[in-house]
């Protein structure tokens, strides 16, 4: 197994531990067991718990970017903006898991500064994705922060709902936000 294969294997194992057991239970030993590797074999590629955590966050960002690229390719016009932003909402099990992990990083980074870089990486990725979406509709760059706040707020509310609860209201709210951006662009006053 080459280094890239090992990194991928360990990153995916770390992701499974994160989603199953939570951030506070993530350890080199647990990830090694999940990957079916002896802990000593991770010594060079993932020497610390922080490096394992960073690999899991990188995997999250990579998966998100892949889905966003697919959405953008499928709809390279203004409808792509909606498709891209919908990828940021926990509307299925995969996106719900991603959001649960992200929220745990937010909460725990408030008291553990070592978690801040991982949180910042995920936060900046979402901000960048919002910028990509708004670029498709010709919205002003100043609207990125507002859109990021809207998407984060909708995502948190969806996460707080019981699994399987209707999510149509959040999609309608996102559509209303995009309509307001379009109206603002048409009539900037």
PLM region spans:
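Short, basic, alpha-helical segments at the C-terminal edge of helix-turn-helix-like DNA-binding modules
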Residues: 58-64
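Helix-turn-helix
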Residues: 6-9, 13-51, 55
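Solvent-exposed, amphipathic alpha-helical segments
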Residues: 9, 13-21, 67-70, 105, ...
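Amphipathic C-terminal alpha-helical segment
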Residues: 91, 108-111, 148-167, 179-185
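N-terminal intrinsically disordered/low-complexity leader segments
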Residues: 1-5, 185-189
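Amphipathic alpha-helical packing segments from all-alpha helical-bundle domains
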Residues: 65, 94-103, 111-137, 145, ...
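Hydrophobic alpha-helical connector segments
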Residues: 55, 66-99, 143-147
């Amino acid at each position: 197994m080459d280094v890239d294969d090992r990194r991928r294997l360990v990153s995916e194992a770390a992701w499974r531990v994160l989603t199953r057991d939570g951030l506070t239970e993530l350890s080199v030993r647990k990830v090694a067991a999940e990957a079916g590797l002896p802990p000593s074999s991770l010594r060079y590629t993932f020497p610390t718990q922080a490096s394992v955590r960073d690999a899991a966050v990188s995997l999250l960002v990579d998966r998100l970017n892949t889905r966003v690229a697919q959405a953008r390719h499928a709809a390279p016009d203004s409808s792509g903006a909606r498709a891209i932003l919908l990828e940021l909402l926990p509307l299925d099990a995969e996106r719900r898991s991603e959001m649960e992990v992200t929220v745990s990083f937010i909460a725990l980074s408030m008291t553990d500064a070592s978690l801040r870089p991982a949180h910042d990486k995920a936060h900046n990725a979402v901000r960048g994705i919002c910028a990509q979406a708004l670029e498709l509709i010709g919205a002003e760059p100043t609207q990125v922060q507002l859109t990021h706040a809207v998407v984060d707020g909708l995502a948190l509310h969806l996460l707080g709902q019981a699994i399987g609860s209707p999510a149509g209201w959040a999609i309608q709210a996102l559509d209303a936000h995009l309509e307001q951006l379009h109206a603002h662009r048409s009539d900037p006053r």
